[in-house]
Amino acid sequence: MRLSFLSVAIRASLAVGISHIFTSQVLADVATNSEDAPETTLDTLVIRSDAYRTTATKTALDPEKTPMSYSRIEQETLQQRQADSVASALRYEPGVSSESRGTVGIFDEYTLRGFKNYSNFYDGMRLPYDGTWNLMPQVDAYATEAVEVLKGPASSLYGYNEPGGMVNQIAKTPKNTPENEIRLRAGTNNLKEIAIDSTGPINDTTNYRMVALAREKDGQMQTTEEKRVLLNPSIEYKPSNNISVLANLYYQDDPHQVPSTPLPSVGTVYKASYGKLDADAYAGDKWNDFSKKVFMPSETINWKINDLLTFKHTLRYTDADAQQKNTYHQGFSEGSDSKLIRTAYTTDEKMTNWATDNQLAYNLITDNTSHNLLLGVDYQKTDSTAKYADAMYNGIPIIDLSDPDYDLFSKTALSLTGYQQTDDIEQSQFGVYLQDEMQWNKLTVVAGLRHDDYKSTTKTTATGSDTKTTVNEANQTSGRLSALYQLDNRFAPYVSYAQSFQPVLGVNYITGEAFKPTTANQVEVGIKYSSADKATKATLSAYDITRKNDKVTAIDWTKQTQTGETTSKGFEISADHRFNDWLNVGVGYGYVDAEITKDEFHPEYVGKMPQQVAKHKASLWAGITPNNKTILNLGVRYQSGMQINQANSDTLPSVTLVDVSGSYQISPTLTAGLNVSNLFDKTYVGSCYDRNNCWMGAERQASVSLTAKF
């Protein structure tokens, strides 16, 4: 029952959160005044520890001096934009197509500079994904201090990755000043949420933080629901200014989430005999469901050995599992444009992962030149099992989209024995990287090189066939060379060359050999600007990416070879300006010209744009502060239509959406908030993979909140 679930979750979260809040208040009273940080008033207060390192370089290099496209979305912005996920956090990021499946929240999916990306990072280390089904650990936006976006290839620091870039979520960490927050939120789709964030000192050397959340709401699609509970305690021990030890635990339980159940293009993109479907249309059944649990403890050591030498070590363990019950369809029954022929399937996935990253940094200064040398060694090992069972259309009832009945499945008679497959996968990666960050007068040069040894062993047992073992390996060296020069007028042009690779699982149908990794390279030029008073910041970048060794279909999806190539050329503009004390405006635009440049088996696809990529994306975000108690925000985002299929036989309509948010400080400790995304409730199709698989865009979501800070 929904109420019983929320009741238990709220009580658990309150018990943990209030106990920590109470503890922090008592201990803060006995803490020495010398531990209290000085109070500073800024437009947006951003506190970063001495150990902070950016995603772009794994160093503390100022973003204005970083010779590549890099941005950071702070927690305050995430809350203003009602972001509960990475995908929603990227709505206003140029060059990024996010929420292409707006009704689905089981994984964070987006394209960066024209390339699909499923691999997210958490505190600088990859969240594991074995490349099979849907078990992808997620970190809720409320437990995230910031989201950092690095565009372009990043394999010289992070190993295998898609060439469009990477997204890194920065965890909330303990602070040495008491801060406590309780937030209540309610909204459309029966949204109910309580969130707690408490931090402060335990004693002179130890700080804690506890982040907890319980959320439930109805899913956008009919009869679906979403529930989440997370606990994220952390503790930092700092016996001196030279060493700190951080222990972090992230636990998330999603007992109910909305699976990815596609709709046909008829009724969504195209008008059917009964008209068009609403945004909450669903081709599934009440039987459909998705659940996931993630348990991630980690520890980080930062050690300042001396003024020139520092060491950072991180170790993380992940234990995750996911169960799915879902349907897909084979098109309409003969003579109908509303009755879908469906089948049912289940997936049962389990995964464990060990990951470590170790960095030694040495600051060498010679005459007018400084070298920040970084030597790193990282390793990760993933063991996973994915079980798949499919009814193969045996006894699965048809659904009539014009008059849907979502309670057609007989759970006792449902047979999933038409086809079954089990994949046992072992993956490992060992990487060594070296980077020199050189600064000479106004010139910054970043040069990096990394070598990776990757291996994946997959044992597949399927109905009607013997067990098959496939071994995919990648021994790859990736590099990056970038330079930026700061002019006297505060403009800073830069140029960058970077490489990436991505392992490909499976066997080449023609050669019988294991697939090789895809490889990519990018050339990027750009210019940055930052005014002396920091009121204006802007970045203009242009890029050219080529990826080789793409998989292409030889006969059908089970028989593939590796002779494809994809290129993506484009440019991005982002600018923020604070006009005065009460008006801030940010604008962004991204142009992506991605196309398939090689496909020997399907020459008709050459020159076509990949699916789920928007060629144009533009946005505007304005923040208004009429007084010291009121904040108003208005956002407008435009996205051009994506292609309906690989052949580009049609283009989806473009869409313009409006978001608003605001807050009012009722008292020094109490603030009321309002957030509305898709203000005018625009019904649109988020994306299609082909004419049989389309997903609606996110409908209007509104919420009110009450936040107590003390």
Where are these regions (language model features)?
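Acidic, small-polar-rich N-terminal luminal/periplasmic segments of exported/outer-membrane proteins
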Residues: 30, 38-177, 182, 500, ...
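Outer-membrane beta-barrel translocator/receptor signature
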Residues: 128-129, 142-145, 156-233, 237-243, ...
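Acidic/polar loop-and-plug regions of large Gram-negative outer-membrane beta-barrel proteins
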Residues: 215, 219, 232-238, 242-304, ...
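Structural signature of Gram-negative outer-membrane beta-barrels, strongest in the C-terminal barrel
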Residues: 238-240, 351, 368-372, 378-382, ...
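Surface-exposed extracellular loop regions of Gram-negative outer-membrane beta-barrel proteins
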Residues: 255-269, 383-385, 480, 484-524, ...
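Face-selective signature of the C-terminal outer-membrane beta-barrel domain
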Residues: 297-320, 342-460
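Membrane-embedded beta-barrel scaffold of Gram-negative outer-membrane proteins
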Residues: 302-304, 308-316, 320-326, 517-600
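Gram-negative outer-membrane beta-barrel transporters
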Residues: 442, 544, 562-647, 671, ...
